[in-house]
Amino acid sequence: MAALPAQLAISTPAHAVETFHTCTGFIDSIPTTISTQGTWCLRNNVSTSITSGAAITIATNNVTIDCNDFKIGGLGAGVNTNTSGIYASYKLNATIRNCSIRGFRTGINLGSADAAVVQDNRLDQNTYRGISVSGNGTLIQRNQVNDTGAGPAAITEVSAIYTSGSTTVEDNIVQNVIASNGTNVSVYGFQITSGVGSSVSRNIARNLVANGTGGSYGIYTSNGLKAFITGNRVAVTNANGIGIRCNASNGSAKDNITWGFSTGIDSGCYNDGGNTSH
């Protein structure tokens, strides 16, 4: 089986050894499904060329995936991939940490996943979304999301980090969200939808490149209430778009810096001071 119980004798890089004694079991090949609660760990790089489904499916509540800085790879499926790197739906308390995930349609895809935590991951070369999390009480922090885009022509938008529901998004770095294919594709560094009282703070987004009449958006909130957008830095080179966008005067913007957008911070945001647009 791909997911194996923890064993005493293992061969691993030194940097990962400290965490292995806490592992419920190991993920040694993919695709695989996790059906037992606990902490499931990688101890080597794994990859797959499947074009649909998921490399790792979380099928129960209270699961942690700890990759120990190893890679989950999906580049073999090509740019038309329909695969998620890690997937869960209607599962509580999922945690994804210390993973390097590349080459999927969506790197981390958690739907209706209340209390999910996504932290300390590196995602790159995913074609549609790097991280996508819906659910309330979620936390997305200290992730690096690079080189999102290059999907099939049918894609109409690309997001590095997408959320739906009340969430906290903090201390993430997003770089190179680029609409390489398609027509009039909009790109988003942080796309925050729905939820009440979401917090988006101390994030960085740079080099967001739409195509055609599509727009570039550093932080884009919609259909939500009372979002707090604080201390973020977003930058592009002369983009048609908005650095920070709030929905229907339902967001507070404070101490943010935007650079290179046609509109730095739109009028839907309450300007609570310290914001600068260049």
What are these regions (language model features)?
Residues 1-16:
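Sec-dependent, cleavable N-terminal signal peptides
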Residues 9, 116, 138, 145, ...:
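Low-complexity, intrinsically disordered tandem-repeat tracts enriched in small residues
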Residues 20-28, 39-52, 63-106, 278:
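Right-handed parallel beta-helix/beta-spiral solenoid domain characteristic of secreted/periplasmic
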Residues 20-24, 71, 228, 250-278:
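Functionally critical loop-and-helix segments that line ligand-binding/catalytic clefts
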Residues 37, 59-62, 67, 81, ...:
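Parallel beta-helix/beta-solenoid
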Residues 51-56, 78-87, 103-110, 125-132, ...:
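Extracellular beta-strand/beta-solenoid scaffold signature
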